[in-house]
From Swiss-Prot:
Catalysed reaction, written as an equation: glycyl-tRNA(Ala) + H2O = tRNA(Ala) + glycine + H(+); a D-aminoacyl-tRNA + H2O = a tRNA + a D-alpha-amino acid + H(+)
Pfam families: Tyr_Deacylase (PF02580)
Keywords: Cytoplasm, Hydrolase, RNA-binding, tRNA-binding
Notes on the domains: A Gly-cisPro motif from one monomer fits into the active site of the other monomer to allow specific chiral rejection of L-amino acids.
PANTHER family for the chain: D-AMINOACYL-TRNA DEACYLASE 1, D-TYROSYL-TRNA TYR DEACYLASE
GO molecular function, one term: D-tyrosyl-tRNA(Tyr) deacylase activity
Compartments reported by the entry: Cytoplasm
Species lineage: Bacteria, Pseudomonadati, Chlamydiota, Chlamydiia, Parachlamydiales
Family note: Belongs to the DTD family.
Main location: cytoplasm
Name of the protein described by the UniProt record: D-aminoacyl-tRNA deacylase
Enzyme class: hydrolase
Function: An aminoacyl-tRNA editing enzyme that deacylates mischarged D-aminoacyl-tRNAs. Also deacylates mischarged glycyl-tRNA(Ala), protecting cells against glycine mischarging by AlaRS. Acts via tRNA-based rather than protein-based catalysis; rejects L-amino acids rather than detecting D-amino acids in the active site. By recycling D-aminoacyl-tRNA to D-amino acids and free tRNA molecules, this enzyme counteracts the toxicity associated with the formation of D-aminoacyl-tRNA entities in vivo and helps enforce protein L-homochirality.
Motif (Gly-cisPro motif, important for rejection of L-amino acids): 137-138
């Protein structure tokens, strides 16, 4: 799994020019699902996401997580995170999970995240969406569950 985590003041997802989901202060998460992902990657990613201390404490130091801040989380699936642009002029998506597998893992990810964080909203899997947000900081991190083996 590849997660692009952005600390935001607000974020919205529109589908067909209609507001689908919106959050206030919290995290905007773009979620890419790799063809090798499974429940182990989901559990690790969810745990890391909800406990990552990227919100400022009273001293301005990144020392609080999204749960401690009572922040919201907006999750948007994005298979293009696994696009390979190194060869040719058109990206290939060989590393991305196929849509049926990705949908199942996406749903599992959301279910596990909702167990850990009370304020979770989503985009619509597979839909053409317009996403807008206001970064806070900006603070942005890229986290890949398969990379944890390198740590």
């Amino acid at each position: 799994m590849k997660l692009v985590i952005q600390r935001v003041l607000q974020a919205q997802v529109y589908i067909d020019d209609n507001l689908f989901s919106a959050i206030g202060p919290g995290l905007m998460l773009l979620l890419g699902i790799h063809h090798q992902d499974n429940l182990e990657q989901i559990l690790w990613s969810v745990d890391k996401l909800v406990h990552l201390r990227i919100f400022n404490d009273e001293n301005g130091k990144m020392n609080r997580n999204v749960k401690e801040c009572e922040g919201e989380i907006l999750v948007v699936s994005q298979f293009t995170l696994y696009g390979n642009c190194l060869n040719g002029r058109r990206p290939d998506f060989i590393q991305a999970a196929s849509p049926p597998i990705a949908l199942s893992l996406y749903r599992q990810f959301i279910d596990e995240l909702k167990k850990e964080a009370p304020h979770v909203k989503t985009g619509q899997f597979g839909a053409q969406m317009q996403v807008s947000l206001t970064n806070d900081g900006p603070v942005t991190f890229i986290l890949e569950s398969l990379d944890r083996r390198k740590a």
